Amino acid sequence: MTLDVPKYENFSKVYDLFNDEMPYNLWLDIIKYYGENVNSILDIGSGTGTVLNALKVPRKVGIDNSLTMVEIARENDPTSEYFCDDMTQFDLSESFDMIIATADVLNYAKDVTAFGNVLQNAYKHLNKDGVFIFDVHTEYKMKTDFNYELYSDSNDDVFYTWQTIPGEAELSVWHELTFFIKVQNDLYEKFEETHYQQTYKHSDILQLANEAGFTIHHSFSDFDIDNPLTEVAERNFYILKRL
């Protein structure tokens, strides 16, 4: 399998249907806690615009590598600007008070070099005293929830299955998605996509953040700012600052 960056071109059509139970309110609580007085924000991997649309910030920009996602976001959220771009090499020619990358976006950085490039890009696009917030899957989650597990979901118009297969690299996973979208009456159209994710050890993330120029302000797990990183957490959060 090649490590092409997944673009969610087909899944974007049903993305919101199967993310309606995602705890976006918890991400928003964290963003608002650390960004009480921000005047500009950049969302890396902004998807269909759910997070930015919920924020009351004067200047809001989102980037995503899926043009279909960007088009949907533009329709959903006229209060923000959205661009199709690569998180490892974007250049927007402006800087922001806050940058966010929610819902394990950084796990789509296919290797440590790509992960470091995202951090360096974020640093370059932050104002002085700016904050970068992101989360990643934990080692525990990669080894348990994504260890040949099969998931499925459906509603009246869509059915999909999601097979997880551990990748060749340590702490990596292939997501094989198959979904059927109703087009009329009993006629369904089948789509298939394969996505690759890689997570990174806490010590490696700290090193890459330091190399990018960041100060590590805080780290915690599972949406609780008072919850230290633990071996059985599912999602780790990082709050980085450009001083």
Regions found by a protein language model. Name each.
Residues 1-47:
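Conserved class I S-adenosyl-L-methionine
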Residues 48-89:
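Class I SAM-dependent methyltransferase SAM/SAH-binding core
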Residues 202-243:
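C-terminal lobe and adjacent flexible extensions of AdoMet/dcAdoMet transferase-like proteins
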Residues 133-206:
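SAM-dependent methyltransferase
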Residues 97-113:
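A short SAM/SAH-binding and catalytic strip from SAM-dependent methyltransferases
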